[in-house]
Every structure is written in structure tokens, then in C-alpha cells.
């Protein structure tokens, strides 16, 4: 919305997929641990490729986590709250990990971000009157995903969302 309000004529949705093969907008398939509250939700953190591991100050080992859209279902994805992309590598708790925004950035929107499906982005962009372009993200998981969801299936599904929404190619 901010991009359209600031005059952007073309807005994009970076498309990734969930465990149940629903398309969502994400900068990367594996950025949920730094862009959402997933590590602070125990039942979802447990599903992450690498659940949150606290830093070890004694050894200097940084905190780590890796949470992918393909680790969770669409319903679980939609339950998350978006935040500024940041983390605290010296965190010993999930809350500290999420509070890693650099001083020169703002946390004004840190806990209120709404995560969107690809279909929701199409509807929003149409309502805003902007042009849009999808970016099909390269999966970080092996394809075909879970044995039968190929890169071609993923691309076809994205295109089908536009067809279903009545978007004509230009």
C-alpha cells in the first residue's frame, strides 16, 4: 500500500509456497525467522527447518534459526505477524532475537505487518489501480517438493492465479 501511495506505478509480489502448496508473498522462501514472529510462537518455531537456537555468549556462538514458508501451512502462515527484517545474533531468547532492528531503522511497524497470499496481493493491487509484476522465487527446497510438486507446477499455479483473477497479460 505504501508503494502505491508514494506513486509506484508497478508493485510486485515475490511468490513463494507453503507446505500445503499455497502461494504467498515473501521476499525469500527462507526469511520468516527474521521477518515475522515465528520464533516466538513455540508450536510454529518447532516446525522450522532450524528452530531458534540461542546464542552462547561464553563461546561467542551466535543465535540461529531458519524458517521457510514451506515449513508451515497457509493457515499457520496467516497467523504470523510481519516485522522489519532484522535479528539479534547475540540473542538468548526468541524475543531478543526478534528485537534486532538497527538503530537507524524503525520498529514503528514491527509487530503489525500483515502477511498476504498471492491471490490477496492481486486483489489489493487491482483495488489500488497499480500495475503489478510477479517474481517467482527460486525455491531453497529440493524440487520437486515432497516428490511431486515441480518447478513447472509452481509456475503454472502462479499464472493460474492471474487467469482466475481476470488479469490479462500486457
Regions inferred by a protein language model and the residue ranges of each:
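Phosphate-group recognition and catalysis centered on beta-loop-alpha active-site segments
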Residues: 1-170
